[in-house]
Design a protein with these regions (language model features):
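Conserved core architecture of multi-subunit DNA-directed RNA polymerases
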Residues: 1-391
Length: 391
């Protein structure tokens, strides 16, 4: 019966990188000012606490959904970068893509018949139910290893220069540093057919998305400010980091538009790259840790997710719920193979909610009558901890 009610059945899920157009379409406000509140204590429009991003003050209504604090989930905004910056989480992927494509024509450094061979292999694995992500990745890695060995491009015969990655986000060709703008330009020119061989689905994901031109700004509910006893506001670590990003981004735009010397523009560009990198991960190897004035390291996005105290292990896997306990399983030679031993204290304390009906009424009455007697702990009888009457 239920099977006929379901119009469609999900058979697979594709994960994709979010592109700049989609970030802007999901955004409810463009953030351009680093200031948060005005003199009267109200959020500044187009600032990091703009009321279009949600509200955290009781009584105020969100300007996007018109809901109050406890009903509004929050909404994303966005920051437009003056110059592109590299997402440090994808540096190795960018290196693989650049190393296996031509620096001149941006074609994959494999003859066309080899490209067709790998493409057909990946398509067969994708269509086959027996195919797995692991086998696809093996073929993709094999194609990349084969392409990296090429000394000249088989399509335009241009000689290839070895690319190196200075962690976390600096790419060099024979000592010359590639700017994020050059990296993005080369990634944009890679044809869709070659991208499939590299494991990309060009209909949903392009490699240039790994070089950011737009940064999503998380809702206010994700980074709420707190009011101290003195009456002053203390902003969240993510808000502090976004303030740094906005200020440097504004200075970079002003200097670039004013025709400042290239050295000054490059220094500000590197500083923007640093702030964006530490915004994602404040423990990135090879760069200094961003800190408060007190010296405490900022807790940015990756630090909120990973590790024992992170969102997954602490708040999702290890959350506290009713009718459950965690205890050591007791070994016992008298237990059946399909049984586990549980300490008596946990067994008596934990309750299983049972709805009384005509089929179990007599059994429930017996449980109430023969309930556990603390004066006779040797006589174990399952009991009832409490009863909820319908009236």
């Amino acid at each position: 019966m239920i099977r006929h009610m379901i119009p469609k059945r999900i058979c697979s899920i594709d994960f994709a990188l979010i592109g700049p157009k989609e970030i802007r379409s999901l955004s409810t406000s463009k953030v351009i000012t680093a200031d948060t509140y005005d003199d009267d204590g109200f959020p500044i429009p187009m600032g990091l606490m703009d009321m279009h991003l949600g509200v955290i003050e009781p009584g105020l209504r969100c300007k996007t959904c018109s809901r109050k604090l406890d009903e509004c989930p929050g909404h994303f905004g966005h920051i437009d970068f003056a110059m592109p910056v590299i997402h440090s989480g994808y540096s190795k992927v960018i290196k693989d893509v650049l190393s296996s494509t031509c620096s001149g024509c941006s074609r994959l450094l494999l003859p066309q018949e080899r490209i067709d061979h790998y493409t057909s292999l990946l398509e067969k694995i994708h269509e086959s139910e027996a195919g797995t992500t692991v086998t696809m990745q093996e073929h993709i890695r094999r194609a990349i290893r084969e392409a990296v060995k090429a000394k000249t491009c088989p399509h335009c015969t241009e000689a290839q220069i070895k690319l190196t990655l200075d962690k976390p986000t600096t790419f060099r060709e024979e000592g010359r540093k590639l700017t994020p703008k050059e990296v993005r330009s080369r990634l944009e020119k890679i044809p869709a057919g070659d991208l499939r061989t590299l494991g990309f689905n060009p209909e949903t994901t392009r490699p240039e998305y790994m070089v950011l031109t737009v940064l999503p700004v998380p809702p206010v509910s994700v980074r709420p400010s707190i009011t101290l006893e003195s009456g002053e506001r203390s902003e969240d670590d993510l808000t502090h980091k976004l303030v740094d990003v906005l200020r440097i981004n504004q200075r970079l735009r002003e200097n670039r538009d004013a025709g400042a010397p290239q050295l000054i523009v490059e220094d500000l560009w590197e500083l923007l790259q640093y702030h964006v990198t530490t915004y994602f991960d404040n423990q990135t190897a090879g760069i200094p840790t961003a800190r408060h004035r007190s010296g405490r390291p900022l807790k940015t996005i990756i630090q909120r997710l990973k590790g024992k105290e992170g969102r997954f292990r602490s708040n999702l896997s290890g959350k506290r719920v009713n009718f459950s306990a965690r205890t050591v399983i007791t070994p016992d030679p008298y237990l059946s193979i399909n049984q586990v031993g549980v300490p008596e204290m946990a067994a008596r304390e934990l309750t299983v909610p049972v709805r009384t009906n005509i089929h179990n009424l007599q059994f429930m009455k017996w449980l109430m009558k023969e309930n556990f007697d603390p004066s006779d702990p040797e006589r174990y009888i399952p009991g009832i901890n409490y009863m909820i009457r319908p009236d």
